[in-house]
């Protein structure tokens, strides 16, 4: 099942939306609860009378301390403004002297009603006793306070949800930072932690891919260095034998002096043969390292029947000239393969060189073509001749063939059983 891929932006937007919905629901719930509590406990008639009586006492004290008369309307307005949420009405001698709601045009005209008489309280002013009515929205301040607390609580819930939601991403980012420091310390075998499918996971995967590629590069370099060291050791050993023989034959020929003779000719012929063997070794070594320095072979799609037929025909003609018998079985298929023609020719040249050096001319050389829908193979087998020529123990020719086949996306296999030697050249069929 394909994973849903959320970017960090989408994740954050979704998180904020969820946090907003949850905090909004919590805010409305808290507001309903606090409103019910305030309405139940602070909106009763008893609480209203208690608060009114308390404000009457507070106002009476304010009047006494400032020796106010019923005409000090400015001072009354300042007190009302300071206390907030209340209405103040003052009567004296049955007439309205001050009202925090009405305009001054009504002062002295509005009379004290029976309702006002029943709900007013006596307060002593500097100019005599007056009747004072204080009405207040006493619970309003609690509604405002509850609203602020509810909003604060919902905001805290919103922040907690958002912080809790991004905590995992922050922890993962910290983990990536720590693992990068581990890699910087040289611990290249340490694997990066890959979690999820967002940008952070993509960064971690990119670093992990880079780590693996770097390790593969180091491994390839180490293998190449080990192969080069081994090859140098083997080549020094293989070149020592013909070189020693060459020197000995030249010394023998030198001792013969200027006189021509059968023994001198034999020494010269042997020296010439060893020189050719050394040249062959050096040529193979040069070709091998030349392949190593090249990057990629330029491949082209060719018809098997045309290209392989031409190459095989040329090689068989050479073998016939050298008095070898060749048996061919199988047919060349009507398929196509990707090859580099130059390197393919070098592959066949190396195969031919090995046959000329080591194949027994008294025995047949067998060449077999094998193919199916996916592959095309060339099987070559021969009997190894018994001679005083020591085969190249380093297998440099085989290594060159294997490397060129690999560069052409093919494969090379060889095996020796007793006196029989077998090789397989494998190519993958392609479409034109």
From Swiss-Prot:
Pfam families: HAMP, HisKA. PROSITE patterns: HAMP. GO terms for cellular component: plasma membrane. It catalyses: ATP + protein L-histidine = ADP + protein N-phospho-L-histidine. Residues 1-12, 167-432 are cytoplasmic. Residues 34-145 are extracellular. It is a multi-pass membrane protein. Residues 167-219 form the HAMP domain. Residues 234-432 form the Histidine kinase domain. The chain crosses the membrane at residues 13-33, 146-166. The modification Phosphohistidine is found at residue 237. SMART domains: HisKA (SM00388). InterPro entries: Bact_Sensor_His_Kinase, HAMP_dom, HATPase_C_sf, HisK_dim/P_dom, HisK_dim/P_sf. It is found in: Cell membrane. One of its GO terms (molecular function) is ATP binding. Its EC number is 2.7.13.3. It is an enzyme of class 2 (transferase). Keywords: ATP-binding, Cell membrane, Kinase, Membrane, Nucleotide-binding, Phosphoprotein, Transferase, Transmembrane, Transmembrane helix, Two-component regulatory system. Member of the two-component regulatory system YrkQ/YrkP. Probably activates YrkP by phosphorylation. This is Sensor histidine kinase YrkQ. It comes from Bacillus subtilis (strain 168).
């Amino acid at each position: 099942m394909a994973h849903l891929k959320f970017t960090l932006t989408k994740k954050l937007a979704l998180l904020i939306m969820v946090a907003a919905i949850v905090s909004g629901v919590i805010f409305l719930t808290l507001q309903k609860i606090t409103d019910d509590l305030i309405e139940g406990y602070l909106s009763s008639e008893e609480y209203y009378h208690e608060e009114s009586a308390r404000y009457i006492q507070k106002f009476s004290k304010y009047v006494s301390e400032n020796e106010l008369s019923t005409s000090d309307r400015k001072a009354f307005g300042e007190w009302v403004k300071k206390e907030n949420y209340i209405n103040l009405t003052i009567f004296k001698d049955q007439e309205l002297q001050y009202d925090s709601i009405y305009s001054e045009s009504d002062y002295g005209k509005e009379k004290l009603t029976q309702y006002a008489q029943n709900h007013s309280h006596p307060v002593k002013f500097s100019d005599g006793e007056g009747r004072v009515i204080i009405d207040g929205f006493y619970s309003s301040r609690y509604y405002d306070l509850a609203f602020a607390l509810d909003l604060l609580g919902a905001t805290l819930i919103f922040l907690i949800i958002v912080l809790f939601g991004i905590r995992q991403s922050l922890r993962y980012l910290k983990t990536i930072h720590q693992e990068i420091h581990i890699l910087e310390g040289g611990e290249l075998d340490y694997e990066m932690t890959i979690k999820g499918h967002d940008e952070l996971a993509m960064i971690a995967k990119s670093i992990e891919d880079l780590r693996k590629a770097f390790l593969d590069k180091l491994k390839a370099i180490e293998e190449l260095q080990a192969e080069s060291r081994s090859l140098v050791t083997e080549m020094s050993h293989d070149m020592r034998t013909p070189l020693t023989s060459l020197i000995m034959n030249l010394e023998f020929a030198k001792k013969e002096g200027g006189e021509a003779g059968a023994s001198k000719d034999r020494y010269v012929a042997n020296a010439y043969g060893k020189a050719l063997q050394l040249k062959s070794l050096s040529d193979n070594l040069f070709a091998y390292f030349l392949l190593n320095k090249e990057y990629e072979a330029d491949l082209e799609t060719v018809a098997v029947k045309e290209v392989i037929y031409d190459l095989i025909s040329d090689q068989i003609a050479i073998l016939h000239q050298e008095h070898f018998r060749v048996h061919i079985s199988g047919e060349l298929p009507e398929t196509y393969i990707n090859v580099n023609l130059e390197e393919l020719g070098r592959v066949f040249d190396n195969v031919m060189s090995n046959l000329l050096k080591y194949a027994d001319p008294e025995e047949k050389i067998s060449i077999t073509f094998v193919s199916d829908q996916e592959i095309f193979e060339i099987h070559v087998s021969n009997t190894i001749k018994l001679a005083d020529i020591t085969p190249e123990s380093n297998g440099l020719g085989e290594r060159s063939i294997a490397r060129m086949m690999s560069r052409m996306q093919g494969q090379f296999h060889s095996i020796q059983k007793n006196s029989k030697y077998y090789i397989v050249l494998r190519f993958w069929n392609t479409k034109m």
